[in-house]
Amino acid sequence: MGVFRFISISLAAVSAANAAQILSMPHAQTVPNSYIVMMKDDTSDDDFNHHQSWLQSTHTHNITRRATIQNAGMRHKYNFSKMKGYSGIFDEETIKDIAKDPKVMFVEPDTIISVHGKVEQSNVPSWGLARISNPQPGAGSYIYDSSAGEGITVYSVDTGVDVNHEDFEGRAIWGSNQVNDGDDRDGSGHGTHTSGTMVGKEFGIAKKAKLVAVKVLGNDGSGPTSGIVAGINWSVEHARQNGGTKKAVMNMSLGGSSSSALNRAAAQAVEQGMFLSVAAGNDNQDAQSSSPASEPSVCTVGSSAEDDSRSSFSNWGPAIDLFAPGSNIISARPGGGSQSMSGTSMAAPHVAGLAAYLMALEGISGGAVCDRLKELGTSSITDAGPGTPTNVLINNGGAKGGKPNPNPAPSPSPSPSQPSEPQQPTPSQPGQPGEPFPGEPQQPTPSQPGQPGEPFPGEPFPGEPFPGEPFPGESAPAPAPQHPHTPYPGGDNFDFDGFWKKYFGGEHWRKMFSSFWN
């Protein structure tokens, strides 16, 4: 009996010694009792499934015994590339039990992440597009190659997007809602604004790229880290099954306190071949203290003003890769029209849009894109900030690049296994990342919040006015000067039903979508 007791105590001591670290987040705003658990890289699918089964049993036992937390349990599961993990609401004893599993890498408190933009009243004209295609400030035209990002998909990981805004011309779709608020729209305006800069017909850089809305922040512009990691996971899987991660860009105009879990998720997305543009933050401090800006493999973007100075609010430091226009940027607002915003949130989508543009033009992908952007940029930023290793402002090199790509990639050719015409779609559950886009128009069916969005429908999604409400603590913005929109022939008086039937019915619809996703 004594020997058995000795062995038990020894095993307990070994388990405690090998327990995973439960990270502390003393300076962050945390979500009560919510945690993110990351498994080690060598965790197999069987190990992960076994851990989840064990967790369910342990959690149920602990809650039954103590009954201290309401609505507890696992919420998100992460499984892409080498990264496996999950998030959930657990009591302290359950977290200690989780950390004892030798397959667990670390446990991190769930923290609040916010957008890096702010609404400002301004009547200045939009200047960012002209600046990134001309060698000097003050130009009035945007010069670009007609390829304009065609064949590239941009994932807006943000507050959602008004996908029906006229500036997107039907190239934007709703993807996923990880906020689980049942509100599949952009109630703040932030995500619609950043998306307009990336792919809008009038406001955008990559004017022919597609866009997928991934909502990870609520209408107040904030959300938990666990949901953002889930949004990254969803985006990678959707890209992998719809054209490939090497033809995908992700923009993250958000950030918060340093998070190992968020940085790890961002790094895994880059490892899968995606390009990630991340806002540096608006605190006029070292960006190295925030996530995901501090992740070395992403392209971290500071903000510049019209005179090529660093914007007064922009973060700085060793994490900065590039600068882009971010002060007084006019772009799309929910419900139609435009508004002006400032922030590194506005700078990052300039980089994401230019990345999509270059990926289509030169065939590059992943981490090579950030290096190419640095090569094409101009060394013109003044007062880049303490410890900032670069003063490079992005530039498209004048339509064709201006400088030759030293390692041009071959033009992608269609796979011989792909049919020349899309096959008829088969019924499937809406919201799966790999669900193909239909060859014929069909009515959309409702999807559950938090699941990948539906394929392009044959009829437009029913629109409704969006509030475009200001961020907390800000006054409502005055409407920016309205730009003439002519997204369809005939202006405001054209026959929409006749236009839709003519251009989006029957065989024309099939041919359009055959090339759209291939």
UniProtKB/Swiss-Prot annotation:
Domain Peptidase S8: 126-400
Subcellular location: Secreted
Name recorded for this polypeptide: Subtilisin-like protease 1
Pfam families, alphabetized: Inhibitor_I9 (PF05922), Peptidase_S8 (PF00082)
Keywords: Glycoprotein, Hydrolase, Protease, Secreted, Serine protease, Signal, Virulence, Zymogen
Propeptide residue intervals: 20-116
Regions of compositional bias (Polar residues) in chain numbering: 282-294, 378-394
